[in-house]
């Protein structure tokens, strides 16, 4: 028998979430646009994607969003073992999206990278930011953590706001200005893939602004093992 929850993370289910929000008069914004508008706490929907792995699937959300004429923010890793953001496969897809109004940002666990490579923390972050900035027009970042992460970069980010501004980072995605104004909805493992705390549909019913965080490697078109 098919698991009743097995279609929760299909592209069809994702498009249904967006359509539900549109039907309930939500306005879609990138993270940058949300901050530029003063972080409104009602009827705004942010689609945030942390691109962790599975490069062949990097635009699975973007393709769905194009169909429904909404825009999102994708945070991209530079220093990692899973993909090259400047590859022949990944870069054209993300650059095309940026030209269409999608936002690209940096996704990084630079503290962990520093610990494992002996590159100073500030140098690691600056180098990642400069590398991605050379290919995309970026303004923000989000901190990355693997399931088995050893070091968390977020505390360092929160304590070094002036340094972030100095190298050109205008915002970080876990800023209180964002989190205090939205219902934060995301998928995760508990122990299997599920929605944490609440589902997108439950959040939409409240009328409050929503930040929906998703990860491309957990989503699929037809079934979870298609790639």
Which sequence ranges carry the predicted segments?
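Terminal accessory/targeting
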Residues: 1-48, 52-101, 111-227
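Beta-strand-loop-alpha-helix segment that lines the small-molecule cofactor/substrate pocket
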Residues: 103, 107
């Amino acid at each position: 028998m098919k698991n009743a929850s097995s279609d929760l993370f299909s592209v069809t289910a994702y498009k249904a979430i967006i359509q539900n929000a549109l039907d309930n008069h939500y306005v879609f914004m990138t993270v940058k646009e949300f901050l530029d508008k003063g972080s409104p706490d009602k009827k705004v929907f942010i689609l945030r994607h942390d691109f962790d792995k599975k490069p062949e699937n990097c635009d699975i959300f973007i393709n769905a969003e194009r169909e429904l004429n909404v825009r999102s923010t994708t945070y991209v890793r530079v220093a990692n073992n899973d993909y090259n953001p400047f590859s022949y496969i990944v870069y054209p897809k993300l650059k095309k999206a940026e030209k269409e109004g999608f936002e690209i940002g940096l996704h990084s666990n630079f503290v962990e990278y520093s610990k494992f490579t002996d590159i100073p923390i500030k140098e690691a972050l600056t180098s990642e930011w400069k590398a991605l900035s050379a290919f995309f027009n970026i303004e923000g970042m989000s901190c990355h953590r693997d399931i088995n992460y050893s070091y968390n970069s977020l505390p360092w980010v929160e304590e070094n706001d002036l340094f972030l501004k100095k190298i050109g980072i205008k915002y970080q995605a876990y800023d209180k200005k964002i989190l205090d104004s939205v219902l934060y909805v995301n998928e995760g493992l508990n122990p299997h893939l599920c929605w944490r705390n609440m589902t997108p549909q439950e959040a939409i019913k409240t009328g409050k602004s929503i930040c929906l965080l998703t990860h491309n490697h957990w989503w699929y078109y037809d079934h979870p093992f298609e790639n």
